[in-house]
Amino acid sequence: MSVSPSSPAPTENPPAATEDLAWRKHIPALAAAVAGIREASDAWDAVSDSFCDTDGWPVDEQGYEDAKVKRDAEAWRHVEVFLDHGPEVLAGVRATARSADYAEGPLSEDLRWLRGIDATLEHAGQLQREWDQILALMDASMPGSRQLYEGRTKEERNADGWHYADELAIRGPALVRAAEHLVRRADAEQSAHTTRARAALARSASGLRGTMPASPPAPSAPGAPVPGRSR
């Protein structure tokens, strides 16, 4: 299977010690973010039709817009979690996965789904940086204007970010599954290594006990007759 140009080429990595997988601590946050984006999307799907006629045109435009604003805001909150935790987990997965994982096995499909997630995270991060710059310009050039315009600019950012939230709802689960699989495998390999090491140590200790030299005979008691000598 070919690898995306944006993805580093897989290498044959030795079994990773579990203590080296520092990125594992970020996995629960990503799993929660995936669930959060899905919940925001499902909540929108549940009410969006109620604001529209049978042809799909809004009949309650204000209600439709308010519900969409709420969806975008909730989804973006979880996109920010991906921006904080996703790059480190993605790098860890790619550093830990082996060449064989890309070709076949339980990881292969999830690794394929990770193609393009770099671009999604980069574009979402750029959107966040642009919004931060806008706020900084407001504070610098129009003191006091932030309170007037921040809410509206935030809504615009969230609306633009919905596309990236939707992408992460598709590719994010693959990242979480791949990360969890690699961590479990590393734990299992580390446990097996520890078991083998203990068994080898036990065999070594047993062998040393079996070859210990015999103790020298105890000296004869004083006055005892010497064997082989006549009186």
Where are the regions that the model predicts?
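Leu/Val/Ala/Ile-rich N-terminal alpha-helices, chiefly Sec-type signal peptides and the beginnings
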Residues: 1-81
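Amphipathic alpha-helical coiled-coil/helical-stalk segments
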Residues: 111-205
